[in-house]
């Protein structure tokens, strides 16, 4: 299996399965001298960790990350950083009944057809459990971006099913289990999720992620545009079926006089483009949104088939998130941070000596 790495100068490679012994990742390209400890990653891992909320899966994993290499006396050495998280709460017996049955809406069928076999225990490599290592690697990128360049990455749940955030107060995101920025909707969210659990069904969501402090110039046209790489990274997250940069699909209904971001020496007057122009960062906040489908692991019966081709009625057992969008918030932050870190190092390698006489502007 290829496709386990992302990045060119800041390269993250993950390995491991949902019910395997452990998950791991290798980070190549992190500059030396960055103070780094397991605690720097643990905060974001705890935000993603299962079993911490009644709104997410009941699987309980400590997700305690271990640094295997690349750090000496509390600082990165510039060599490969090896990270590992042990799996401790697998219940593989929950999946014994689907050993020969495909779960509709999951990767079971496609993995079987592509590789001629599959790890049926929780989806194996296709499980969102793998994203724990992306979050760990993203935490390294986030620390470097903030400490060295003042770049901050923040995500939040902007919509869960029919409930959308009408006000965005980022100070409230870490104060509730939904990572939701509109406190006036928390009671409605709680009630909606309770009813959803009773029905045995699941729901989709929209997650937004913003990066502030991003300098002008990141992005490598034509095929390595910054927005293209962001979309690639976010689309690589489990259950994501759509990505928007800036106004996204809303531009379909905009006129040119509405959608362009007017500018003056005082700054940009709007940010419809989401901080990227021509595939290059403009100095405005990077804004991206992603749509996540409802998980197919539900207790509502549905038709499927066996590996032998027989039709069966399927009910998925196990411990699953009724809305995967909640725990996707720190994952989205991690992937955006990894892309920005990679492009920052690439820009520095090629254009560090470039001096422009044009004044830099930001958001007015």
UniProtKB/Swiss-Prot annotation:
Its EC number is 4.2.3.5. Reduced FMN (FMNH(2)). One of its GO terms (biological process) is amino acid biosynthetic process. GO terms for cellular component: cytosol. Keywords: Amino-acid biosynthesis, Aromatic amino acid biosynthesis, FAD, Flavoprotein, FMN, Lyase, NADP. It holds the Pfam family Chorismate_synt. The keyword Acetylation does not apply. One of its GO terms (molecular function) is FMN binding. InterPro entries: Chorismate_synth, Chorismate_synth_AroC_sf, Chorismate_synthase_CS. It is an enzyme of class 4 (lyase). It catalyses: 5-O-(1-carboxyvinyl)-3-phosphoshikimate = chorismate + phosphate. Its cofactor is FMNH2. Pathway: Metabolic intermediate biosynthesis; chorismate biosynthesis; chorismate from D-erythrose 4-phosphate and phosphoenolpyruvate: step 7/7. CDD domains: Chorismate_synthase. NADP(+) binds at residues 48, 54. FMN binds at residues 125-127, 238-239, 278, 293-297, 319. Belongs to the chorismate synthase family. NCBIfam families: aroC, PRK05382.1. Homotetramer. This reaction introduces a second double bond into the aromatic ring system. This is Chorismate synthase. It comes from Shewanella denitrificans (strain OS217 / ATCC BAA-1090 / DSM 15013). The lineage of its organism: Bacteria, Pseudomonadati, Pseudomonadota, Gammaproteobacteria, Alteromonadales. The gene is aroC.
């Amino acid at each position: 299996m290829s496709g386990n790495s992302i990045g060119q100068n800041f390269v993250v490679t993950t390995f491991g399965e949902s019910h395997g012994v452990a998950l791991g990742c290798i980070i190549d390209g992190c500059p030396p001298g960055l103070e780094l400890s397991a605690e720097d990653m643990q905060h974001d891992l705890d935000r993603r960790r299962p079993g911490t909320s009644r709104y997410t899966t009941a699987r309980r994993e400590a997700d305690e990350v271990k640094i295997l290499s690349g750090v000496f006396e509390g600082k990165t050495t510039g060599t490969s950083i090896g990270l590992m998280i042990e799996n401790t709460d697998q219940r593989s017996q929950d999946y014994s009944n689907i050993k020969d049955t495909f779960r509709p809406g999951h990767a079971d069928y496609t993995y079987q057809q592509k590789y001629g076999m599959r790890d049926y225990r929780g989806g194996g490599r296709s499980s969102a459990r793998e994203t724990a290592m992306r979050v760990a690697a993203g935490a390294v990128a986030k620390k470097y971006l903030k400490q060295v360049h003042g770049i901050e990455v923040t995500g939040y749940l902007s919509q869960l099913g029919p409930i959308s955030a009408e006000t965005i107060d980022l100070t409230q995101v870490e104060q509730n289990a939904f990572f939701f920025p509109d406190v006036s909707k928390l009671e409605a969210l709680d009630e909606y999720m309770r009813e959803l659990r009773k029905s045995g069904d699941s729901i989709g969501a929209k997650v937004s992620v913003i990066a502030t402090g991003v300098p002008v110039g990141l992005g490598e046209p034509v095929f390595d545009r910054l927005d293209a790489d962001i979309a690639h990274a976010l689309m690589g997250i489990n259950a994501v079926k759509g990505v928007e940069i800036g106004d996204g699909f809303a531009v379909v209904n905009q006129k040119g006089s509405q959608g362009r971001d007017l500018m003056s020496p005082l700054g940009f007057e709007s940010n419809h483009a989401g901080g990227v122009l021509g595939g290059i960062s403009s100095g405005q906040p990077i804004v991206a949104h992603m749509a996540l489908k409802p998980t197919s692991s539900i207790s509502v019966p549905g038709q499927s088939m066996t590996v032998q081709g027989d039709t069966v009625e399927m009910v998925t057992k196990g411990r699953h998130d009724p809305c995967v969008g909640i725990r996707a918030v720190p994952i989205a932050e991690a992937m955006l941070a990894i892309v920005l870190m990679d492009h920052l190092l690439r820009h520095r390698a090629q254009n560090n000596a470039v001096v422009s006489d044009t004044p830099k502007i930001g958001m007015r």
